[in-house]
Amino acid sequence: MKKGISLVLAALMAVSLVACGGGSAAKSTTAAASEQTEKQTEKAGETEAKKEETKGEAKTIGVSLLNSTHVFYNSIQTAMEEQAKEYGWTLDVQDAAGDANKQLGQVQDFITKKVDAIVIAPTNSAGSKSMIELAEKAGIPVFTMDIASDGKPVTHVATDNKKGGQLAAEYVVNNILTEKKGNAAVITYSEIESCVDRETGFTDYLKENAPDIKVVDVQNYSGDQQKAADVMQNMLLKNDNIDVVFCVGDPAAIGALSSITAANAATKIIGYDGNPEGVAEIKKGGNWVADVAQDPAGIGKTTLEAIKKHLEGEKVDSEILIAPYIIDAKNAK
Protein backbone atom coordinates (compact mmCIF):
# COMPACT_ATOMS: atom_id res chain seq x y z
CA MET A 1 0.00 0.00 0.00
CA LYS A 2 2.74 2.40 0.97
CA LYS A 3 4.55 1.39 -2.19
CA GLY A 4 1.43 2.25 -4.25
CA ILE A 5 1.04 5.64 -2.57
CA SER A 6 4.69 6.35 -3.25
CA LEU A 7 4.24 5.56 -6.95
CA VAL A 8 1.20 7.87 -7.18
CA LEU A 9 3.08 10.69 -5.47
CA ALA A 10 6.03 10.19 -7.81
CA ALA A 11 3.72 10.34 -10.82
CA LEU A 12 2.07 13.51 -9.54
CA MET A 13 5.47 15.12 -8.98
CA ALA A 14 6.50 14.16 -12.51
CA VAL A 15 3.33 15.72 -13.95
CA SER A 16 3.95 18.80 -11.82
CA LEU A 17 7.51 19.09 -13.13
CA VAL A 18 6.37 18.67 -16.74
CA ALA A 19 3.68 21.30 -16.22
CA CYS A 20 6.19 23.73 -14.73
CA GLY A 21 8.59 22.98 -17.53
CA GLY A 22 5.89 23.67 -20.13
CA GLY A 23 4.91 26.83 -18.34
CA SER A 24 8.50 27.97 -18.20
CA ALA A 25 8.99 27.38 -21.96
CA ALA A 26 5.78 29.26 -22.78
CA LYS A 27 6.81 32.16 -20.56
CA SER A 28 10.26 32.23 -22.22
CA THR A 29 8.73 32.20 -25.74
CA THR A 30 6.28 34.96 -24.83
CA ALA A 31 9.06 37.08 -23.38
CA ALA A 32 11.21 36.62 -26.50
CA ALA A 33 8.30 37.51 -28.78
CA SER A 34 7.54 40.55 -26.65
CA GLU A 35 11.18 41.65 -26.81
CA GLN A 36 11.24 41.17 -30.62
CA THR A 37 8.03 43.21 -31.01
CA GLU A 38 9.48 45.97 -28.85
CA LYS A 39 12.64 46.05 -31.00
CA GLN A 40 10.59 46.19 -34.23
CA THR A 41 8.39 48.96 -32.82
CA GLU A 42 11.47 50.86 -31.70
CA LYS A 43 13.10 50.46 -35.13
CA ALA A 44 9.91 51.55 -36.92
CA GLY A 45 9.71 54.53 -34.61
CA GLU A 46 13.30 55.49 -35.44
CA THR A 47 12.55 55.21 -39.19
CA GLU A 48 9.45 57.38 -38.90
CA ALA A 49 11.36 59.87 -36.75
CA LYS A 50 14.08 60.02 -39.40
CA LYS A 51 11.44 60.60 -42.10
CA GLU A 52 9.85 63.38 -40.10
CA GLU A 53 13.27 64.91 -39.48
CA THR A 54 14.04 64.77 -43.22
CA LYS A 55 10.66 66.33 -44.06
CA GLY A 56 11.43 69.30 -41.90
CA GLU A 57 14.88 69.95 -43.31
CA ALA A 58 15.54 72.55 -46.00
CA LYS A 59 17.29 70.94 -48.96
CA THR A 60 19.58 72.27 -51.66
CA ILE A 61 19.27 70.62 -55.05
CA GLY A 62 21.85 71.13 -57.80
CA VAL A 63 20.37 71.22 -61.31
CA SER A 64 22.37 71.16 -64.55
CA LEU A 65 20.22 71.81 -67.62
CA LEU A 66 21.20 70.90 -71.16
CA ASN A 67 20.38 74.35 -72.50
CA SER A 68 18.56 77.12 -70.62
CA THR A 69 17.89 79.08 -73.82
CA HIS A 70 15.53 76.33 -75.01
CA VAL A 71 11.86 77.09 -74.27
CA PHE A 72 11.36 73.49 -73.19
CA TYR A 73 13.97 73.78 -70.44
CA ASN A 74 12.65 77.17 -69.38
CA SER A 75 9.33 75.47 -68.65
CA ILE A 76 11.03 72.65 -66.74
CA GLN A 77 12.99 75.15 -64.63
CA THR A 78 9.91 77.22 -63.80
CA ALA A 79 8.00 74.13 -62.66
CA MET A 80 10.93 72.96 -60.53
CA GLU A 81 11.27 76.37 -58.90
CA GLU A 82 7.57 76.43 -58.03
CA GLN A 83 7.75 72.93 -56.53
CA ALA A 84 10.94 73.74 -54.60
CA LYS A 85 9.27 76.83 -53.14
CA GLU A 86 6.41 74.66 -51.92
CA TYR A 87 8.89 72.32 -50.20
CA GLY A 88 11.00 75.15 -48.78
CA TRP A 89 14.01 73.96 -50.77
CA THR A 90 16.74 75.86 -52.62
CA LEU A 91 17.60 75.17 -56.26
CA ASP A 92 21.06 75.84 -57.66
CA VAL A 93 20.28 75.86 -61.41
CA GLN A 94 23.14 75.91 -63.93
CA ASP A 95 23.14 76.02 -67.74
CA ALA A 96 25.47 73.50 -69.42
CA ALA A 97 24.82 75.21 -72.78
CA GLY A 98 25.19 71.89 -74.58
CA ASP A 99 28.79 71.49 -73.37
CA ALA A 100 29.63 68.16 -71.69
CA ASN A 101 32.81 69.51 -70.07
CA LYS A 102 30.89 72.45 -68.67
CA GLN A 103 28.27 70.10 -67.26
CA LEU A 104 30.97 67.96 -65.63
CA GLY A 105 32.36 71.07 -63.95
CA GLN A 106 28.91 71.96 -62.66
CA VAL A 107 28.41 68.49 -61.17
CA GLN A 108 31.84 68.66 -59.52
CA ASP A 109 30.89 72.04 -58.07
CA PHE A 110 27.63 70.60 -56.69
CA ILE A 111 29.63 67.83 -55.03
CA THR A 112 31.99 70.37 -53.45
CA LYS A 113 28.98 72.30 -52.15
CA LYS A 114 27.58 69.06 -50.68
CA VAL A 115 24.11 69.53 -52.13
CA ASP A 116 21.42 67.05 -51.05
CA ALA A 117 20.69 65.78 -54.57
CA ILE A 118 21.74 66.47 -58.16
CA VAL A 119 19.53 66.65 -61.25
CA ILE A 120 21.10 66.34 -64.70
CA ALA A 121 19.53 66.86 -68.11
CA PRO A 122 22.55 65.31 -69.89
CA THR A 123 24.32 67.00 -72.76
CA ASN A 124 25.51 63.54 -73.74
CA SER A 125 24.05 60.19 -72.69
CA ALA A 126 27.41 58.39 -72.56
CA GLY A 127 29.38 61.21 -70.97
CA SER A 128 26.96 61.66 -68.08
CA LYS A 129 27.74 58.19 -66.72
CA SER A 130 30.99 59.37 -65.10
CA MET A 131 29.19 62.34 -63.53
CA ILE A 132 26.68 60.05 -61.85
CA GLU A 133 29.48 57.83 -60.55
CA LEU A 134 31.36 60.83 -59.11
CA ALA A 135 28.28 62.01 -57.21
CA GLU A 136 27.47 58.52 -55.96
CA LYS A 137 31.00 58.17 -54.52
CA ALA A 138 30.35 61.40 -52.63
CA GLY A 139 27.08 59.98 -51.30
CA ILE A 140 24.87 62.33 -53.33
CA PRO A 141 21.89 60.82 -55.20
CA VAL A 142 21.54 61.74 -58.87
CA PHE A 143 18.34 62.05 -60.89
CA THR A 144 18.17 62.54 -64.66
CA MET A 145 15.39 64.12 -66.67
CA ASP A 146 14.40 64.43 -70.31
CA ILE A 147 17.56 62.78 -71.68
CA ALA A 148 18.53 59.33 -70.45
CA SER A 149 22.04 58.56 -69.24
CA ASP A 150 24.17 55.47 -69.80
CA GLY A 151 24.76 55.62 -66.04
CA LYS A 152 22.35 54.54 -63.31
CA PRO A 153 20.58 57.44 -61.60
CA VAL A 154 18.09 56.92 -58.79
CA THR A 155 15.34 57.60 -61.31
CA HIS A 156 14.90 59.05 -64.78
CA VAL A 157 11.91 61.29 -65.56
CA ALA A 158 11.07 61.90 -69.20
CA THR A 159 8.57 61.82 -72.00
CA ASP A 160 7.84 58.36 -73.40
CA ASN A 161 9.91 59.17 -76.47
CA LYS A 162 9.42 55.96 -78.42
CA LYS A 163 5.70 56.49 -78.02
CA GLY A 164 6.17 60.06 -79.26
CA GLY A 165 7.90 58.83 -82.41
CA GLN A 166 5.13 56.33 -82.91
CA LEU A 167 2.49 59.08 -82.60
CA ALA A 168 4.28 61.04 -85.34
CA ALA A 169 4.29 58.01 -87.63
CA GLU A 170 0.61 57.32 -86.92
CA TYR A 171 -0.14 60.91 -87.88
CA VAL A 172 1.67 60.43 -91.19
CA VAL A 173 -0.36 57.31 -91.97
CA ASN A 174 -3.72 58.69 -90.87
CA ASN A 175 -3.46 62.29 -92.09
CA ILE A 176 -0.71 62.80 -94.69
CA LEU A 177 0.04 59.62 -96.65
CA THR A 178 -3.33 57.98 -96.16
CA GLU A 179 -2.76 55.48 -99.00
CA LYS A 180 0.27 54.26 -97.04
CA LYS A 181 2.66 55.07 -99.88
CA GLY A 182 5.31 57.77 -100.19
CA ASN A 183 8.66 59.03 -98.95
CA ALA A 184 9.58 60.17 -95.46
CA ALA A 185 12.79 61.55 -93.95
CA VAL A 186 14.05 62.07 -90.41
CA ILE A 187 16.23 64.82 -88.95
CA THR A 188 17.63 63.19 -85.82
CA TYR A 189 20.00 64.05 -82.95
CA SER A 190 22.14 60.92 -82.63
CA GLU A 191 24.16 62.09 -79.61
CA ILE A 192 21.03 62.19 -77.46
CA GLU A 193 19.39 58.89 -76.49
CA SER A 194 15.89 60.34 -76.09
CA CYS A 195 16.03 61.73 -79.63
CA VAL A 196 17.23 58.39 -80.98
CA ASP A 197 14.22 56.81 -79.23
CA ARG A 198 11.94 59.25 -81.09
CA GLU A 199 13.55 58.29 -84.39
CA THR A 200 13.26 54.58 -83.58
CA GLY A 201 9.60 54.88 -82.57
CA PHE A 202 8.87 56.61 -85.89
CA THR A 203 10.76 54.29 -88.23
CA ASP A 204 9.70 51.07 -86.47
CA TYR A 205 6.02 52.00 -86.68
CA LEU A 206 6.25 52.68 -90.43
CA LYS A 207 8.13 49.43 -91.07
CA GLU A 208 5.49 47.42 -89.25
CA ASN A 209 2.33 49.25 -90.32
CA ALA A 210 3.08 51.04 -93.60
CA PRO A 211 6.07 49.39 -95.31
CA ASP A 212 5.39 51.26 -98.57
CA ILE A 213 6.13 54.56 -96.84
CA LYS A 214 9.89 54.54 -97.27
CA VAL A 215 12.25 56.40 -94.95
CA VAL A 216 14.58 57.58 -97.72
CA ASP A 217 16.92 59.75 -95.64
CA VAL A 218 18.02 60.12 -92.00
CA GLN A 219 20.51 62.85 -91.07
CA ASN A 220 21.85 64.26 -87.81
CA TYR A 221 21.53 67.94 -86.85
CA SER A 222 23.37 67.70 -83.48
CA GLY A 223 21.01 70.17 -81.84
CA ASP A 224 22.04 73.02 -84.17
CA GLN A 225 19.13 74.83 -85.85
CA GLN A 226 21.25 76.16 -88.71
CA LYS A 227 22.66 72.71 -89.32
CA ALA A 228 19.08 71.42 -89.54
CA ALA A 229 18.44 73.95 -92.32
CA ASP A 230 21.54 72.71 -94.15
CA VAL A 231 20.54 69.08 -93.63
CA MET A 232 17.05 69.71 -95.03
CA GLN A 233 18.48 71.51 -98.04
CA ASN A 234 20.76 68.54 -98.67
CA MET A 235 17.86 66.11 -98.35
CA LEU A 236 15.80 68.02 -100.91
CA LEU A 237 18.71 68.04 -103.36
CA LYS A 238 19.50 64.34 -102.89
CA ASN A 239 15.96 62.99 -103.15
CA ASP A 240 13.43 63.43 -105.95
CA ASN A 241 10.56 63.74 -103.53
CA ILE A 242 10.14 63.91 -99.76
CA ASP A 243 6.50 63.96 -98.72
CA VAL A 244 7.10 64.44 -95.00
CA VAL A 245 10.02 65.03 -92.64
CA PHE A 246 9.93 64.08 -88.97
CA CYS A 247 12.13 66.35 -86.84
CA VAL A 248 13.07 65.01 -83.40
CA GLY A 249 13.06 68.52 -81.89
CA ASP A 250 11.39 71.83 -82.72
CA PRO A 251 14.74 73.60 -83.38
CA ALA A 252 15.30 71.03 -86.14
CA ALA A 253 11.80 71.70 -87.49
CA ILE A 254 12.41 75.47 -87.53
CA GLY A 255 15.61 74.95 -89.51
CA ALA A 256 13.93 72.50 -91.87
CA LEU A 257 11.05 74.91 -92.49
CA SER A 258 13.39 77.65 -93.67
CA SER A 259 14.92 75.38 -96.33
CA ILE A 260 11.57 73.92 -97.41
CA THR A 261 10.15 77.43 -97.79
CA ALA A 262 13.22 78.62 -99.73
CA ALA A 263 12.92 75.65 -102.10
CA ASN A 264 9.15 76.16 -102.46
CA ALA A 265 8.78 72.46 -101.63
CA ALA A 266 5.54 70.78 -100.58
CA THR A 267 7.21 68.67 -97.87
CA LYS A 268 5.17 68.48 -94.68
CA ILE A 269 6.82 68.79 -91.27
CA ILE A 270 6.10 67.04 -87.99
CA GLY A 271 8.08 68.50 -85.11
CA TYR A 272 8.65 67.41 -81.53
CA ASP A 273 8.39 69.45 -78.32
CA GLY A 274 5.20 71.48 -78.63
CA ASN A 275 7.06 74.78 -78.32
CA PRO A 276 5.18 78.06 -78.98
CA GLU A 277 7.02 78.60 -82.29
CA GLY A 278 5.81 75.24 -83.56
CA VAL A 279 2.24 75.80 -82.44
CA ALA A 280 2.22 79.22 -84.15
CA GLU A 281 3.39 77.67 -87.43
CA ILE A 282 0.78 74.91 -87.24
CA LYS A 283 -1.96 77.53 -86.79
CA LYS A 284 -0.82 79.22 -90.04
CA GLY A 285 -1.80 76.10 -91.99
CA GLY A 286 1.46 75.81 -93.94
CA ASN A 287 4.07 73.06 -94.25
CA TRP A 288 4.39 72.50 -90.51
CA VAL A 289 1.27 70.42 -89.88
CA ALA A 290 1.79 68.71 -86.51
CA ASP A 291 3.97 68.48 -83.43
CA VAL A 292 4.48 65.83 -80.77
CA ALA A 293 3.98 67.76 -77.55
CA GLN A 294 5.73 67.06 -74.28
CA ASP A 295 4.82 68.17 -70.76
CA PRO A 296 7.96 69.99 -69.54
CA ALA A 297 6.20 71.34 -66.45
CA GLY A 298 5.14 67.80 -65.57
CA ILE A 299 8.72 66.56 -65.98
CA GLY A 300 10.08 69.28 -63.68
CA LYS A 301 7.43 68.79 -61.01
CA THR A 302 7.65 64.99 -61.08
CA THR A 303 11.45 65.09 -60.75
CA LEU A 304 11.23 67.15 -57.54
CA GLU A 305 8.52 64.85 -56.20
CA ALA A 306 10.74 61.82 -56.84
CA ILE A 307 13.67 63.47 -55.04
CA LYS A 308 11.49 64.24 -52.03
CA LYS A 309 10.27 60.66 -51.80
CA HIS A 310 13.79 59.28 -52.07
CA LEU A 311 15.20 61.61 -49.42
CA GLU A 312 12.37 60.58 -47.10
CA GLY A 313 13.24 56.91 -47.50
CA GLU A 314 10.48 55.96 -49.92
CA LYS A 315 11.10 53.76 -52.93
CA VAL A 316 10.81 55.40 -56.36
CA ASP A 317 10.65 53.75 -59.78
CA SER A 318 13.87 53.72 -61.79
CA GLU A 319 12.03 55.34 -64.70
CA ILE A 320 8.96 57.58 -64.77
CA LEU A 321 7.55 58.19 -68.25
CA ILE A 322 5.10 60.96 -69.09
CA ALA A 323 2.81 60.47 -72.10
CA PRO A 324 3.17 62.80 -75.12
CA TYR A 325 0.33 63.90 -77.40
CA ILE A 326 -0.20 65.34 -80.89
CA ILE A 327 -0.86 69.00 -81.64
CA ASP A 328 -2.28 69.86 -85.07
CA ALA A 329 -4.67 72.42 -86.57
CA LYS A 330 -7.57 70.90 -84.61
CA ASN A 331 -6.18 71.63 -81.15
CA ALA A 332 -3.42 74.22 -81.66
CA LYS A 333 -3.97 77.17 -79.30
PLM features: residue spans?
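Positively charged n-region of N-terminal signal peptides that target proteins for export
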Residues: 1-11
